[in-house]
């Protein structure tokens, strides 16, 4: 079980809604993933009350919606988007994203912290997308964020846990859930994050652009389950030198045989 704010999740796979070929395919993949928390960009939602091709299927699916502020370049823009989401969708949960750099989509740490402090004071459950910076993650935690979401690699890059060393520190120090977000491109990456001690991962591109998104969603679901089981079982410590599982020295000395 994973507890974030007032909600308990049985799935540790969080998913996104972008890049799917069709809304139907998106819905099928999300169902196959078993995800209970789905993020969506407010800029892609029809707030005029029409038949929204993204929002309506998600509401039918019964998952918790996590509107994000993707597209915001400043704290002020992100706060405005979060307030709009709360008014339109009736949720006080928000994934805080502020990335003014359009090439690498790296989060702005200063604006992110500034927006987080404002939104927490307004009663939002804030899950900030941020760089894998242990100091920043601790500051976001102290500001009242319900979780932190450090990147594994740039958004959509599918490059895996390029920030592994820093993720280890973040996980070690965190007193709130750590959700590895961005860069996870294969089920093995998600498994690695769980073995590191992450509480969950968020995956979008790797599922949406797969040749078979539904099967890929199932693969990620199984990887997360395997990673959690492995962590609960207790992974063996790594060794620099070889350690034989069945020492043969005594056995050979007792035989007394020579060639």
Swiss-Prot record:
Subcellular localization, as worded in the UniProt entry: Cytoplasm
Catalytic activity: [ThiS sulfur-carrier protein]-C-terminal-Gly-aminoethanethioate + 2-iminoacetate + 1-deoxy-D-xylulose 5-phosphate = [ThiS sulfur-carrier protein]-C-terminal Gly-Gly + 2-[(2R,5Z)-2-carboxy-4-methylthiazol-5(2H)-ylidene]ethyl phosphate + 2 H2O + H(+)
One MF annotation (Gene Ontology) recorded for this entry: thiazole synthase activity
Main subcellular location of this protein, as a coarse class: cytoplasm
GO BP: any one term: thiamine diphosphate biosynthetic process
Pfam family, one: ThiG
Pathway participation: Cofactor biosynthesis; thiamine diphosphate biosynthesis
Active site: 95 (schiff-base intermediate with dxp)
Binding site for 1-deoxy-D-xylulose 5-phosphate: 156, 182-183, 204-205
GO terms for cellular component: cytoplasm
Cystine crosslinks: none
The protein's Enzyme Commission number: 2.8.1.10
Listed SUPFAM superfamilies: ThiG-like
Alphabetically ordered keywords of this record: Cytoplasm, Schiff base, Thiamine biosynthesis, Transferase
Family, per entry: Belongs to the ThiG family.
Known partners and oligomeric status: Homotetramer. Forms heterodimers with either ThiH or ThiS.
UniProt function note: Catalyzes the rearrangement of 1-deoxy-D-xylulose 5-phosphate (DXP) to produce the thiazole phosphate moiety of thiamine. Sulfur is provided by the thiocarboxylate moiety of the carrier protein ThiS. In vitro, sulfur can be provided by H(2)S.
Name used for this protein in its record: Thiazole synthase
Organism name: Serratia proteamaculans (strain 568)
